[in-house]
Amino acid sequence: MTKINIDILISLIPMLLVAFFVYEITPILVILSSVITAELAEVIFSFFIQKNRDSLKELSGITIGALTGFVLAPFTPLYVAAFAGAMATIFGKIIYRGTDKKIFNPVILGKLFVFTFFPAVLAPNSPAWTDAEGMRIASDNVSGLASLVLINRGIIGELSIAAMVIGAIYLIYRTKMTWHIPVSFFVTIFFGYYITSSNNVNVVTTLGEIIFMGIFVLTDTFTTPRHGLGKVFFGFLAGLSTIIFWFLGIQTEAIIYSVLILNPFTRPINTIFKPNVFGDEAVSFAEIIQGLGFAIIIVLLAFAVSYLHKFGFVPYIVYIYVVYGIWRLYNNR
């Protein structure tokens, strides 16, 4: 596990350098704030309270904190970034007593907590997204092919598509990531872009954010399927549910909701799409029917969550989850 986290952290270096080049020190401080509180939560709860002496060696707190920082706005208040890192670690990993036992993606949870408790910070018109005085390059100076190398808008992790591709190539080279989830997610999303544009649906999610989430967030080791066909199925459904949310008027939270809906289905998907004793991943008719059943359930859940979002009930679900998490912390002492 330690080697995986080290490789993930190395893959983030190109994006870290780009963030510093575009916005100077501010986004670095945002990421650092998230990392510090994530690791502090790891020390307090895992090391001292749960007596898990090996937790710090995994570097999972640092990795969760770093990735959580990368999905925030470049000028997110440092106390909000610190809150996100701590919540991601506590309620995404620690309450389940280990990285390999977690159900929900910690990074996604960290961002959802920000949406819930600090909704104005990541609003589209929030000053956290841009600061003319803190930018080294003006928006008018980046266009065309140059925007693939460098942009100056969006979450910290999406400021350079080229940097993201370098990070992805490194992870694939180090066999810490496969193509299955990102490619199936991207193909579905790009097809969805065509459909939404044909139906005059305004999609505000940026290409850079889609790429970053598909490469560095959706591929989390223990909250996504293990096998090739299962990964493709997962990526496709993540893209499909995201498109559904777009059509139903949900934009900034679309990918977050999609991943959280899918995470609890990881183990059943592993069961359906596991290779046979000879390593063959061929799918039987019964497994296809089971997969279709899961797909229908996930689509229905996407519609259900959209209505909960519309009527403002999602924060209350988060509050209930917080109570559940505190209860687990108490019982896991």
Sequence positions of predicted segments:
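Alpha-helical transmembrane segments
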Residues: 172-273
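Structural signature of hydrophobic alpha-helical transmembrane segments
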Residues: 24-37, 75-86, 147-161, 198-211
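Long hydrophobic alpha-helical segments that form multi-pass transmembrane helix bundles
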Residues: 101-166
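Cytoplasmic-side transmembrane-helix entry/capping segments in multi-pass membrane proteins
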Residues: 53-64, 80-84, 101-111, 179-187, ...
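C-terminal ends of transmembrane helices
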Residues: 40-52, 89-100, 166-176, 215-225, ...
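Alpha-helical transmembrane segments in multi-pass membrane proteins
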Residues: 7-14, 30-42, 60-65, 69, ...
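N-terminal signal-anchor module of multipass membrane proteins
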Residues: 1-47, 308-317
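Transmembrane alpha-helices
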Residues: 281-333
